[in-house]
């Protein structure tokens, strides 16, 4: 693809939001803050991905290439290591089997807060850190901490940049 076609394709970005992501007033604000159109559909893995329209008119979906899993805070991340562990691991395994690049964005947290136990869970900080770093090693997951109001911008930017890299290296008949 030439640069013009890549830019044209990227301008058609629609964020895909998993139907299992809770649909609340706060979530609606987050979706609006993405600054691009969005649609809800069941995703294979993760909470967010993207779809684009190629110059040929065909849809180019990132669903099986890149996804973002969102957690509200470290307390919710702890649940991924305890009560929701099996479901969470299955999701990472599914993504790994398909070669999907997985990002885990944790709002309102940091590694410093994790090390200092600044979350509401009985989980020991060492156990939380061990889980987070094991996921990075085992599943090639990218764990990023951000503020809640940064999430929509960062989500959009990650999906945009991932798509741009893929499109730049992709051979498509236009």
Which ranges hold each PLM region?
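Non-catalytic C-terminal interaction segments of nucleic acid-processing enzymes
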Residues: 1-63, 75-174
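Conserved catalytic cores of phosphodiester-cleaving nucleases, focusing on short active-site segments
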Residues: 66-72
